[in-house]
Amino acid sequence: MLLPTRTTRLALAGLASVALLAGCTASPDGDAPAGGSSASGGVASLVSADAKSTVDEVKASLGEPTAKDGTKLCYITRTLSNEFWGYERDGFEAEAKRLGVQYQTFDVTDESSITEQLDKAKSALNQGCSAILASPISATGLDSVFQSALAAGIPAIVLNDAKSSLPGVVYVGPDATTIGGTAADYIAGKLPDGGKVAMIEGDPGSSNAINRGDGFTAALKDHPGLDLVASQTASWDQTKAQEIATTMLTANPDIAAFYSQNDGMALGVQAAIDAKGLTGKVILVGTDGIPQAKKQIQAGAYTATVSELPTTEGATGVDVALWLLAGKQVPAWVDVPAFIVDGQNVAQYATGMP
């Protein structure tokens, strides 16, 4: 992976957005039948259980993927009102188009509706998909669909967030626990003398929220000078995050740092900090690396974000699907590490998401 640290960088160019129609996008030939697979019937055996490699290692080992005529990939994503998932979709669709693969994208309207996403995933199974890719809302929410797909010889691939524990399902994305730990370590570096910190959590049922929170609190134990005085869910909602952060700052006016489990909520925290006249005085670390957060980092109102690589993840999911369909062995975890974006390097990532 070209972005495993704060010093190595990757830039994917030319990944264009595709217009979304009626909660579902498809390639021009989206209704064509799915192509056959040399892995059909035994696709789960092609996934190396417990194996983990970076995306660059996997690409170097397996080479450029190719597709048979009629191959169609289906991606079940989250709500596209969250621009992070829009970039994930863009990576998926751009790579599918680059490789001449038919595709179809299914999104949900409610970020917390496991039922809605499950219904979309079940529908995808009936659309002639050669492989199923998904960004599940919960760790087990789409397992029944994954099981059905694998039983039919259809690869199942998770892009970011809820890593399934089912054998044969490939996960493409970062370690969410490490993301939380990275945020805690960064804050500790900014507060060498310690101080009070607060955390704004995502939806309680979200694997990302759970794992990022666990990583953050675990890492705080390595920094005894940091005192977690408040932690509350805002369920990925910016307005709720602003209200909660305002209450936290009223109760603890000497809070020195906030960690928000995504950038959308962090923008709400920033508004609360600004309203208290504390702009630039309270450390604010978000997660995801969305463009709006990076604009605020450039303006000096927002300290840092632990940036993920959704465009890279979406594109890599296409590659993994095609490798599996070609009968190639793939690790169960294709790691796409996150990295810190702050005032020192934000100019390199001011627009878009890698």
Model-based region annotation:
Residues 2-13, 19-354:
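A residue-level marker of the well-folded mature domains of exported/periplasmic proteins
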